[in-house]
């Protein structure tokens, strides 16, 4: 496909990037911390960590992993925590030790955590105490040999940290009891690491940096193998796209999205490290009043988020009173930005929400609206520099502009494949092209618009939910005979999970089924709607027709609206 979109690029956005500007993420990091040493890198709960402190602490943590635990280059280390100052210390410590980061959603259930730890073969995990009870239930069934435990306030000043840890544990009671007698404290790891020798590993661009887990049509999470080059390429692509709006050493980005999510990991953490910017880490973005209080303290210049976050902020009266004069970049992704939200955002802040599109397998950015756009296009924008894109029909033939087809992409940001899953890799990457499973339309200028999903994936607040996983869990309930899970529109989260159930036990209730799911699934995957049926529609070979149920369910929602 001819790259028609290049003609629509702003004049100062390059058509190609250099993915080999750095040898590794470690090289990028070390150059940035030297250049911006005394500037703030991260702030959380009022505590500032400079680039110099980040360098010192991450070096100590890397040394501890190497010398204290005896881990080697290529070992996998899981990271399970929300946005805290400990996160970047551990993240860059793992990378600087030549090891592979395995990000874990801290809200995972024991079942989900056990699968990810076993699949990745993680030999160590860094976890915040609030979620240690989950790990306790499964750690003996995994290959994890080392548990490094931290508390919410452990990277704050002594007085403040003591207060935070006391309040979190004893007042708010956010730390369920756990028993991990062999765990090492994060503080001890750093203390010991400062006295150990750090040995910088020899890294090449093709070395793995992350195993970033994503769902699959099989319902089993798979690890996308993202190399240092993949991440650096996407970093340069984001920088090329947004760069004209950003000023090195002078930015403060609001990081309300969790850093364990690929969107915030690349665009907030890594990009602003390279630019010498400051990340304002929001630990609990669901506390909108608390988030707004934090925003009022800082002249933030950039913010990233999903539609639900922007909508919640717009509906907060205190947010409406903030000073937006410093803001010059608002980036939305993870889920479609609704037009009404985009229009309200520009009216309040004076800045357009630049919607983009990406997926874990692409580190993540594939396309974004140009920074000079002065309207809400409703599209996912133009392919980013050094990216090829095409739309194909079911026979893999390219379709002309204006016709729907599956979006396929090729570029330096595309993953190596799925960890230990060559079968799944071959299904998604064919002849060098990654098949996204999303059905899109491209207009004459190259703007892409997603019109449907080839896969049955459900998108809840920017998180992928796969029907097979939900169905597998529901079918474990003894009162269920059959089930089908679909996504239906939801004003609060974009989509919500709805299940259609055929009872085996006539006394089965919606409440008991949802309670059962809550024990097995993290919050955003739990069905919000349950409908009991005498039977489910099936094809002539007996396959449940999810699409028919989804269309019917969406029709009901539309009619109610």
UniProtKB/Swiss-Prot annotation:
Task: Give the CDD domains listed for this entry.
Answer: FC-FACS_FadD_like
Keyword flag Membrane: yes
Q: What does the entry report about how pH modulates activity?
A: Optimum pH is 7.5-7.8.
The source's superkingdom equals Bacteria
Q: What is the effect of changing residue 216 to A?
A: Decreases activity
List GO terms (cellular component aspect). cytoplasm; cytoplasmic side of plasma membrane; cytosol
Annotated pathway: Lipid metabolism; fatty acid beta-oxidation
GO: which molecular function terms? ATP binding; decanoate-CoA ligase activity; fatty acid binding; long-chain fatty acid-CoA ligase activity; oleic acid binding; protein homodimerization activity
**EC class of the enzyme, as a word:** ligase
Modification(s) after translation: Post-translationally cleaved by OmpT.
Q: Which terms are listed as keywords in the entry?
A: ATP-binding, Cell membrane, Fatty acid metabolism, Ligase, Lipid metabolism, Magnesium, Membrane, Nucleotide-binding
Induction info reads: Well expressed during log and stationary phase aerobic growth but only poorly expressed during anaerobic growth (at protein level); aerobic expression is suppressed by glucose or C8 fatty acids.
Membrane topology term reads:
Peripheral membrane protein
Q: Which family does it belong to?
A: Belongs to the ATP-dependent AMP-binding enzyme family.
Q: In its UniProt entry, what is this protein called?
A: Long-chain-fatty-acid--CoA ligase
Q: What is the lineage of its organism?
A: Bacteria, Pseudomonadati, Pseudomonadota, Gammaproteobacteria, Enterobacterales
